């Protein structure tokens, strides 16, 4: 049914709870009660957004960005690092390195790549994002979600489009009109 939400409270006992001793830290960090609303918002957002064909990395970035943007609207008083499931330090790293992350994606021609491993490297949860560089261990996981969020925010700032129209737009149209350009 569409009117019932089941929440496994055993997923939110706190990052240091003994039940999670065998879990990796990148998973444990979000197993706390303030993440319940974020997880519900993420699940609900997925129902509002046309699921991409997921043929290109850009389509996945935009899809993830749309989900995070809905959190901006639904829980505006929540800190960004909580919305994306980062620590404060991880979000600071992403913000400080946004230009270089984007440069890496562009220079390595990842945006139109259909390589499935890009999801593992940059979208899916992990201890860090996998650029295959020395700085990998410094980066937060799922950095592609952050970049997608920034693209959507840039699109919304630079275009007068309704929320519903934006959610239904294809990734390429959003990207073309977003005017996304991280500062160095």
Where are these regions (language model features)?
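Acidic/His-rich structured neighborhood in mature extracellular/periplasmic domains
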Residues: 1-91, 168-171
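A cross-kingdom marker for long, charged
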Residues: 58, 62, 67-184
């Amino acid at each position: 049914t569409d009117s019932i939400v089941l929440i496994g409270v055993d997923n939110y006992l706190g990052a240091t709870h003994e039940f999670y001793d065998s879990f990796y830290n990148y998973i444990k960090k979000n197993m706390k009660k303030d993440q319940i609303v974020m997880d519900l918002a993420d699940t609900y957002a997925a129902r509002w957004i046309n699921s991409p064909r997921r043929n290109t990395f850009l389509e996945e970035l935009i899809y993830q960005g749309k989900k995070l943007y809905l959190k901006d609207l639904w829980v505006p008083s929540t800190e960004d690092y909580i919305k994306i499931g980062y620590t404060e330090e991880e979000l600071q790293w992403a913000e400080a390195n946004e230009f270089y992350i984007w440069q890496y994606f562009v220079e390595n021609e990842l945006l139109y790549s259909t390589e499935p491993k890009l999801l593992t490297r940059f979208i899916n949860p992990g201890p860090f994002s996998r650029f295959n560089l020395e700085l990998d261990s410094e980066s937060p996981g799922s950095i592609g979600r952050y970049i997608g969020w920034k693209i959507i925010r840039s699109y919304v700032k630079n275009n007068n489009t309704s929320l519903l129209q934006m959610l239904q737009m294809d990734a390429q149209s959003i990207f073309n009109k977003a005017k996304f350009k991280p500062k160095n």
